[in-house]
Design a protein with these regions (language model features):
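Active-site-proximal substrate-binding core of FAD-dependent oxidoreductases
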Residues: 313-352
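Internal hydrophobic alpha-helix adjacent to the cofactor/substrate pocket in enzyme cavities
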Residues: 172-175, 301-327
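FAD-site-proximal beta/loop scaffold in flavoenzymes
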Residues: 121-145, 238-306, 310-314
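C-terminal auxiliary extensions adjacent to catalytic cores
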Residues: 339-379
Length: 379
């Protein structure tokens, strides 16, 4: 029997496990393949929905499903966080002390926010990357009466267009609640334009200007002074705020940083086409966990998962890998309360954001409902 072990029960891990169960359906039914998923939690969270939770536009319980209900019934599922990954031998030790062995290992441990890496940021800034953070931001917005709003972007971070989305949605929120005239919005970004991807920056900059949103580029956050309500950059720029929102810096999982050689910042050194751990053709990396210099997004995880599913199933059935990952990424961009845009790109095609429309916004809302089919690997 061949054993496939998936570390991580998020979008990437769920799609890989479910996709392999379908591709290797006959082998599973005949007892030739065993698929196991280990996770730190028994709940599956739709992370993009946290952006809507921060504005009170979705109920929190709509963002969760039981992880066991997401997975194919034949997949073994254990809530037992990994504490050590032995990539050389494809073994994983968990918090309970159990050691899981495998023939093929998939590492899909995701990323974590690190606001604590910048003095004062955790204490002063709101963020929407965790349920607690989104809830706190929602509640604080209800009490906000206007003033200086600063959206502070740090790198690296997941969801490439999240900084643009939160800024435009905040603008519409203030307008809808008659607070725009009493407020001033400033957006900070660490490089010399409003987004790392130049075509996105070229699209967003005039949108900001049209809406009266100030942009402070080359702003690498040094610290936040809660006493004076000031955020300070390494370059020496100081901005006053009454309401501070941050896109916090991210790192990969601690277990990856501790276990995998060369995994600086918790990002695994990954072959950009075959998606295996460099030097290990039977250990695959999916989603935020890779160190590939492309956007960390749900769609990235999905497209990578499709490649890994094809390659592992082909290795099992034919002894060879099936195809390459082309770097494809697709992201919706919420441009306000009622309009949306999108952007897609890959290793050879640069992004080119479309014009915001109500139709794209509605499609995004529809996808929010259909996400669970994606996690099950049905979309």
């Amino acid at each position: 029997m061949k054993k496939i072990l998936v570390i991580g029960g998020g979008m990437a891990g769920s799609i890989v496990a479910n996709g392999l169960a379908r591709k290797l359906n006959k082998e599973m039914n005949n007892g030739l393949i065993e698929i196991t998923v280990i996770s730190a939690t028994d709940q599956h969270l739709y992370q993009p929905g946290l952006l809507y939770l921060a504005f009170g536009r979705v109920r929190e319980n709509e963002l969760y499903r039981d992880q066991k209900d997401i997975l194919d019934k034949r997949i073994k599922f254990h809530v037992d966080p990994a504490v050590n990954i032995d990539a050389n031998n494809k073994k994983v030790t968990t918090e309970s002390g159990k050691v899981y062995e495998s023939d093929y290992l998939v590492i899909a441990t995701g990323s974590r926010i690190m606001p604590q890496s910048i003095p004062g940021l955790s204490e002063e800034a709101y963020q929407f990357y965790t349920p607690d953070g989104a809830r706190e931001m929602r509640d604080a917005l209800k009490d906000f009466k206007g003033g200086k709003v600063v959206i502070n972007v740090n790198a690296p971070h997941k969801c490439p267009v999240a900084p643009i989305e939160i800024t435009l949605m905040l603008h519409d929120y203030l307008k809808e609640n008659d607070l725009l005239e009493k407020s001033e919005i400033t957006y900070t970004y660490p490089v010399g334009r409003v987004h790392a991807m130049e075509p996105v920056a070229n699209w967003a900059a005039p949108e900001f200007e049209k809406l009266g949103i100030k942009a402070e580029t080359l702003f690498n956050t040094k610290e936040v002074d809660g006493k004076t309500k000031t955020i300070i950059s390494e370059e020496g720029t100081k901005l006053k705020y009454d309401f501070l929102v941050t896109i916090p810096p991210h790192k990969g999982a601690q277990v990856v940083e501790d276990s995998i050689e060369g995994a600086k910042g918790g990002w695994c050194p990954t072959d950009k086409k075959k998606l295996y751990l460099e030097g290990k053709t039977d250990v695959f990396i999916c989603g935020d966990t890779t160190n590939i210099p492309i956007s960390k997004a749900g769609s990235t995880a999905h497209f990578e998962a499709d490649t890994i599913i094809d390659n592992i199933s082909s290795l099992v059935q034919e002894g060879t890998m099936a195809r390459d990952y082309d770097g494809k990424v697709f992201c919706f961009i919420e441009t306000g309360k009622e309009t949306g845009s999108y952007v897609w790109f890959n290793y050879t095609t640069p992004p080119n954001p479309g014009l915001p429309t109500k139709a794209v916004h509605r499609f995004k809302l529809a996808y929010n409902k259909m996400y669970w089919l994606s996690a099950k690997g049905l979309l």
